[in-house]
Protein backbone atom coordinates (compact mmCIF):
# COMPACT_ATOMS: atom_id res chain seq x y z
CA UNK A 1 0.00 0.00 0.00
CA UNK A 2 1.47 3.31 -1.07
CA UNK A 3 2.25 6.20 1.21
CA UNK A 4 -0.38 8.38 -0.47
CA UNK A 5 -3.05 5.77 0.15
CA UNK A 6 -2.11 5.47 3.82
CA UNK A 7 -2.11 9.25 4.24
CA UNK A 8 -5.46 9.40 2.48
CA UNK A 9 -6.95 6.84 4.89
CA UNK A 10 -5.53 8.67 7.90
CA UNK A 11 -6.89 11.95 6.58
CA UNK A 12 -10.33 10.43 6.07
CA UNK A 13 -10.32 9.02 9.61
CA UNK A 14 -9.30 12.38 11.05
CA UNK A 15 -12.00 14.14 9.03
CA UNK A 16 -14.65 11.70 10.21
CA UNK A 17 -13.50 12.15 13.81
CA UNK A 18 -13.74 15.93 13.47
CA UNK A 19 -17.23 15.75 11.96
CA UNK A 20 -18.42 13.37 14.67
CA UNK A 21 -16.88 15.57 17.35
CA UNK A 22 -18.60 18.67 16.03
CA UNK A 23 -21.91 16.82 15.81
CA UNK A 24 -21.61 16.09 19.54
CA UNK A 25 -20.12 19.36 20.78
CA UNK A 26 -22.78 21.57 19.20
CA UNK A 27 -25.85 19.85 20.70
CA UNK A 28 -24.05 19.35 24.03
CA UNK A 29 -23.26 23.06 24.32
CA UNK A 30 -26.85 23.90 23.39
CA UNK A 31 -28.15 21.65 26.17
CA UNK A 32 -25.77 23.26 28.66
CA UNK A 33 -26.93 26.74 27.64
CA UNK A 34 -30.62 25.84 27.87
CA UNK A 35 -30.11 24.05 31.18
CA UNK A 36 -28.45 27.15 32.63
CA UNK A 37 -31.35 29.25 31.37
CA UNK A 38 -33.81 26.97 33.19
CA UNK A 39 -31.80 27.19 36.42
CA UNK A 40 -31.59 30.98 36.15
CA UNK A 41 -35.33 31.29 35.60
CA UNK A 42 -35.99 28.94 38.51
CA UNK A 43 -33.98 31.28 40.74
CA UNK A 44 -36.35 34.09 39.72
CA UNK A 45 -39.34 31.92 40.64
CA UNK A 46 -37.86 31.23 44.07
CA UNK A 47 -37.18 34.94 44.59
CA UNK A 48 -40.76 36.03 43.98
CA UNK A 49 -42.16 33.21 46.11
CA UNK A 50 -39.81 34.22 48.93
CA UNK A 51 -40.95 37.82 48.60
CA UNK A 52 -44.54 36.70 49.08
CA UNK A 53 -43.64 34.54 52.08
CA UNK A 54 -41.90 37.54 53.65
CA UNK A 55 -45.10 39.60 53.34
CA UNK A 56 -47.27 37.07 55.16
CA UNK A 57 -46.18 37.76 58.79
CA UNK A 58 -46.84 41.50 58.48
CA UNK A 59 -50.14 40.84 56.76
CA UNK A 60 -51.26 38.45 59.49
CA UNK A 61 -50.27 40.88 62.25
CA UNK A 62 -52.13 43.71 60.53
CA UNK A 63 -55.27 41.64 60.07
CA UNK A 64 -55.17 40.56 63.72
CA UNK A 65 -55.83 44.19 64.59
CA UNK A 66 -59.33 43.94 63.16
CA UNK A 67 -61.85 43.02 65.82
CA UNK A 68 -63.45 39.60 65.48
CA UNK A 69 -61.57 38.71 62.31
CA UNK A 70 -62.07 35.06 61.39
CA UNK A 71 -59.45 33.07 63.27
CA UNK A 72 -59.80 30.09 60.95
CA UNK A 73 -58.78 32.23 58.00
CA UNK A 74 -55.69 33.54 59.78
CA UNK A 75 -54.78 30.05 60.94
CA UNK A 76 -55.09 28.72 57.39
CA UNK A 77 -52.66 31.37 56.11
CA UNK A 78 -50.16 30.73 58.89
CA UNK A 79 -50.28 26.97 58.40
CA UNK A 80 -49.98 27.30 54.62
CA UNK A 81 -46.89 29.46 54.99
CA UNK A 82 -45.39 26.91 57.39
CA UNK A 83 -45.92 24.14 54.82
CA UNK A 84 -44.14 26.24 52.22
CA UNK A 85 -41.18 26.51 54.56
CA UNK A 86 -41.10 22.75 55.01
CA UNK A 87 -40.87 21.91 51.30
CA UNK A 88 -38.94 24.87 49.89
CA UNK A 89 -35.88 23.21 48.35
CA UNK A 90 -33.41 26.01 49.04
CA UNK A 91 -30.02 24.69 47.96
CA UNK A 92 -31.50 21.73 46.06
CA UNK A 93 -30.44 22.42 42.50
CA UNK A 94 -32.19 19.45 40.93
CA UNK A 95 -35.80 20.22 41.82
CA UNK A 96 -36.52 21.08 38.18
CA UNK A 97 -35.48 17.51 37.34
CA UNK A 98 -37.42 15.90 40.20
CA UNK A 99 -41.18 15.66 39.49
CA UNK A 100 -42.10 14.47 43.00
CA UNK A 101 -40.28 17.27 44.84
CA UNK A 102 -41.48 19.83 42.32
CA UNK A 103 -45.08 18.71 42.80
CA UNK A 104 -44.82 19.07 46.59
CA UNK A 105 -43.33 22.52 46.14
CA UNK A 106 -46.13 23.62 43.82
CA UNK A 107 -48.86 22.16 46.03
CA UNK A 108 -47.52 24.05 49.05
CA UNK A 109 -47.28 27.31 47.12
CA UNK A 110 -50.74 26.88 45.63
CA UNK A 111 -52.08 26.19 49.12
CA UNK A 112 -50.67 29.49 50.32
CA UNK A 113 -52.15 31.24 47.27
CA UNK A 114 -55.60 29.88 48.12
CA UNK A 115 -55.31 30.83 51.79
CA UNK A 116 -54.21 34.38 50.96
CA UNK A 117 -56.98 34.72 48.39
CA UNK A 118 -59.58 33.74 50.96
CA UNK A 119 -58.09 36.14 53.51
CA UNK A 120 -58.40 39.03 51.07
CA UNK A 121 -62.01 38.15 50.28
CA UNK A 122 -62.89 37.94 53.97
CA UNK A 123 -61.11 41.26 54.60
CA UNK A 124 -63.74 42.95 52.41
CA UNK A 125 -66.15 42.48 55.31
CA UNK A 126 -64.04 44.67 57.61
CA UNK A 127 -64.17 48.34 56.52
CA UNK A 128 -62.02 49.45 59.45
CA UNK A 129 -59.29 47.06 58.34
CA UNK A 130 -59.46 48.18 54.72
CA UNK A 131 -59.19 51.78 55.86
CA UNK A 132 -55.78 51.29 57.49
CA UNK A 133 -52.80 52.46 55.44
CA UNK A 134 -50.68 49.48 56.43
CA UNK A 135 -53.25 47.00 55.14
CA UNK A 136 -53.68 48.89 51.89
CA UNK A 137 -49.91 48.97 51.37
CA UNK A 138 -49.60 45.25 52.05
CA UNK A 139 -52.52 44.52 49.75
CA UNK A 140 -50.85 46.41 46.90
CA UNK A 141 -47.53 44.65 47.54
CA UNK A 142 -49.22 41.25 47.64
CA UNK A 143 -51.14 41.86 44.44
CA UNK A 144 -47.96 42.99 42.71
CA UNK A 145 -46.10 39.94 43.96
CA UNK A 146 -48.83 37.57 42.78
CA UNK A 147 -48.59 39.13 39.32
CA UNK A 148 -44.82 38.70 39.32
CA UNK A 149 -45.22 35.07 40.39
CA UNK A 150 -47.53 34.42 37.44
CA UNK A 151 -45.06 36.04 35.04
CA UNK A 152 -42.02 34.19 36.40
CA UNK A 153 -43.85 30.86 36.36
CA UNK A 154 -44.79 31.44 32.72
CA UNK A 155 -41.20 32.32 31.83
CA UNK A 156 -39.94 29.25 33.66
CA UNK A 157 -42.34 27.02 31.75
CA UNK A 158 -41.14 28.56 28.49
CA UNK A 159 -37.49 27.90 29.34
CA UNK A 160 -38.27 24.34 30.46
CA UNK A 161 -40.19 23.71 27.26
CA UNK A 162 -37.29 25.04 25.16
CA UNK A 163 -34.92 22.66 26.94
CA UNK A 164 -37.21 19.65 26.61
CA UNK A 165 -37.88 20.32 22.93
CA UNK A 166 -34.17 20.53 22.19
CA UNK A 167 -33.47 17.47 24.31
CA UNK A 168 -35.89 15.33 22.30
CA UNK A 169 -34.57 16.48 18.92
CA UNK A 170 -32.16 14.40 16.80
CA UNK A 171 -29.30 13.78 17.50
CA UNK A 172 -29.48 15.60 20.84
CA UNK A 173 -31.68 12.90 22.37
CA UNK A 174 -28.80 10.41 22.12
CA UNK A 175 -26.33 12.85 23.64
CA UNK A 176 -28.71 13.61 26.52
CA UNK A 177 -29.18 9.89 27.10
CA UNK A 178 -25.44 9.30 27.12
CA UNK A 179 -24.91 11.89 29.88
CA UNK A 180 -27.76 10.46 31.96
CA UNK A 181 -28.74 12.53 35.01
CA UNK A 182 -27.00 15.64 33.74
CA UNK A 183 -29.70 16.39 31.18
CA UNK A 184 -32.95 15.05 32.62
CA UNK A 185 -36.25 16.41 31.24
CA UNK A 186 -37.48 19.52 33.06
CA UNK A 187 -40.80 19.64 34.90
CA UNK A 188 -43.46 22.31 34.38
CA UNK A 189 -45.76 24.35 36.54
CA UNK A 190 -49.36 23.27 36.12
CA UNK A 191 -52.41 25.50 36.50
CA UNK A 192 -53.69 25.48 40.05
CA UNK A 193 -56.71 23.24 40.48
CA UNK A 194 -59.78 25.41 40.85
CA UNK A 195 -57.83 28.54 39.97
CA UNK A 196 -60.57 29.53 37.55
CA UNK A 197 -63.07 29.69 40.44
CA UNK A 198 -63.36 32.44 43.00
CA UNK A 199 -62.95 31.23 46.61
CA UNK A 200 -66.23 30.54 48.37
CA UNK A 201 -66.87 32.65 51.46
CA UNK A 202 -69.71 32.04 53.87
CA UNK A 203 -71.40 35.14 55.29
Stretches with model-predicted labels:
Residues 1-203:
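A helix-centric hydrophobic-segment signal that preferentially recognizes long
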